[in-house]
């Protein structure tokens, strides 16, 4: 599927009404986070675990390339026609929050080609701790950080860390190598998030991303019960 492009218009901040998912529509889960946090690897892991039990597709966002979509295709996590890409230009957060038109068009194309979809995973381009998805684009969102940035990242907060539906602290196996204290990260995540869930994971240790997979399955169960 050819990439969709975000046109070069001014980056105004526009509020869209929260998407109201209709019965029979696929659940849309956003996966966001900084560059290198492991978003694409997490998306790949979820696809491998879910592809035999439901109908799903993936939409990636990259600034100037289709690198993340190409990675998913090379690793054959889904058939090629179930993986689409948006090229966002200079501001990756704009395409998922402010001007979501290119993403909505790509989602429409995926649904037109696969009218049985249960789930669409929408991966953002790599951005910073302020990037979040528009509620007009996704139903729920996962925000991925990793321990390589140090154990201070959760207490820095930011919309993604604080308000995402699920926070994932990835690459916990690297903690000893970078001097990160996982208990500090756990404590600080709990402090900034309150009752919102978070998980510490390592795809090197648990390639299925079991806690995240369980959370996604629960979101699907709730959505399909409506």
Swiss-Prot record:
Subcellular localization: Cytoplasm
Any one biological process term the GO annotation gives: urea catabolic process
Record GO terms (molecular function): GTP binding; GTPase activity; nickel cation binding
CDD domains in UniProt: UreG (cd05540)
Assembly with partners or alone: Homodimer. UreD, UreF and UreG form a complex that acts as a GTP-hydrolysis-dependent molecular chaperone, activating the urease apoprotein by helping to assemble the nickel containing metallocenter of UreC. The UreE protein probably delivers the nickel.
Keywords: Chaperone, Cytoplasm, GTP-binding, Nickel insertion, Nucleotide-binding
Pfam families per record: cobW
Disordered: region residues: 1-26
Protein name listed in UniProt: Urease accessory protein UreG
Annotated residues for binding of GTP: 33-40
Homology family: Belongs to the SIMIBI class G3E GTPase family. UreG subfamily.
InterPro entries per UniProt: CobW/HypB/UreG_nucleotide-bd, P-loop_NTPase, UreG
CC per GO annotation: cytoplasm
Species assigned in the record: Mycolicibacterium vanbaalenii (strain DSM 7251 / JCM 13017 / BCRC 16820 / KCTC 9966 / NRRL B-24157 / PYR-1)
Biological role stated in the UniProt entry: Facilitates the functional incorporation of the urease nickel metallocenter. This process requires GTP hydrolysis, probably effectuated by UreG.
SUPFAM superfamilies: P-loop containing nucleoside triphosphate hydrolases
């Amino acid at each position: 599927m050819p990439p969709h492009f975000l046109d070069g218009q001014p980056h105004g901040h526009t509020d869209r009404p929260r998407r109201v998912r209709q019965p029979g529509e696929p659940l849309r889960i956003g996966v966001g986070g900084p560059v290198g946090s492991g978003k694409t690897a997490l998306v790949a892991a979820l696809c491998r675990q879910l592809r035999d039990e439901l109908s799903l597709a993936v939409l990636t966002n990259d600034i100037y390339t289709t690198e993340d979509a190409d990675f998913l295709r090379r690793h054959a996590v889904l058939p090629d026609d179930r993986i689409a890409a948006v090229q966002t230009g200079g501001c990756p957060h704009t395409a998922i929050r402010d001007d979501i038109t290119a993403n909505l068009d790509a989602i429409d194309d995926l649904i037109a080609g696969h009218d049985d979809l249960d789930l669409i995973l929408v991966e953002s381009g790599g951005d910073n701790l302020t990037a979040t998805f528009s509620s007009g684009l996704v139903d729920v969102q996962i925000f991925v950080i990793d321990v390589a940035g140090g154990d201070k990242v959760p207490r820095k907060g930011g919309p993604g860390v604080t308000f995402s539906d699920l926070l994932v602290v990835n690459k916990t196996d690297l903690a000893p190598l970078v001097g990160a204290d996982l208990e500090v990260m756990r404590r600080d995540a709990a402090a900034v998030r309150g009752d919102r869930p978070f998980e510490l994971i390592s795809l090197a240790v648990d390639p299925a991303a079991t806690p995240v997979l369980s959370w996604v399955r629960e979101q699907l169960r709730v959505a399909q019960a409506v």
